[in-house]
């Protein structure tokens, strides 16, 4: 508002009502403003404060014109209300830490359960239970959660990429294998930019799922390929090694073929319309004559 001189009667700058229109209303001058923005209805200011505080009754609110912070007072509360208020504040402060503790505890006991199931799956159900019953409880509480952690860390070791880089570096020396692997030992027209042919970026969900499902896959491969092995532990270990080797060989071959595809990429000329192409050919012939 551009009003500078104080009007003869009070004027609310929220609802624009005057003192004559509502003589029973309570008026307040909460800031240093002068003129027509000096006065405001107590009820209008209360509603305006509710909108600005947005549920935070203890938040500070200032005048939008002069920037003076409003002095807000509350009636004195009794000891019971004060105690309940302190309890409510303490619970509000402690709830994030409690929630974090619940999440950490859930993850920890999930890891313990997964570790116990993995032990029974790898060693055998009866033998696994017997081993865990005879083991120290503290050792189980510390050792079982490390099983999924070690599986995830092992999954993050990308040894196939190292083999692919060695293959690409020494491919010229491996021409004797050109009959087994297409493109082995051939000269490449260009070297692709690293990362443009991988197509296998490190995915958190893929790494986590692959690591946690690995014991089940190792057990299944061991049962299929090494049925004559009587020990469940040895059969699972052999199945895991066989799966890692077969998967690694296929992955290395796939990445190398992607590398060759990118290296032999070729860009074609823009196809001209037939009429323009014939005209261009005639122009070239006439210029040659």
Swiss-Prot record:
Upper classification of the source organism reads: Eukaryota, Metazoa, Chordata, Craniata, Vertebrata
CDD domains listed in its UniProt record? RING_CH-C4HC3_MARCH5
Keyword set includes Heme: no
Where does this protein reside within or beyond the cell? Answer: Mitochondrion outer membrane; Endoplasmic reticulum membrane
Q: What is this protein called?
A: E3 ubiquitin-protein ligase MARCHF5
Instruction: Enumerate the UniProt keywords alphabetically.
Output: Endoplasmic reticulum, Membrane, Metal-binding, Mitochondrion, Mitochondrion outer membrane, Transferase, Transmembrane, Transmembrane helix, Ubl conjugation pathway, Zinc, Zinc-finger
Which organism does this record belong to? Danio rerio (Zebrafish)
Q: What is known of its domains?
A: The RING-CH-type zinc finger domain is required for E3 ligase activity.
The record's listing under InterPro entries reads: Znf_RING-CH, Znf_RING/FYVE/PHD
**PANTHER family hit by this protein:** E3 UBIQUITIN-PROTEIN LIGASE MARCH5
Q: How would you classify this enzyme at the top EC level? A: transferase
Record function comment: Mitochondrial E3 ubiquitin-protein ligase that plays a crucial role in the control of mitochondrial morphology by acting as a positive regulator of mitochondrial fission. May play a role in the prevention of cell senescence acting as a regulator of mitochondrial quality control.
Tell me what reaction this enzyme catalyses. Answer: S-ubiquitinyl-[E2 ubiquitin-conjugating enzyme]-L-cysteine + [acceptor protein]-L-lysine = [E2 ubiquitin-conjugating enzyme]-L-cysteine + N(6)-ubiquitinyl-[acceptor protein]-L-lysine
Q: Extract one GO cellular component term from the record.
A: endoplasmic reticulum membrane
EC number in record: 2.3.2.27
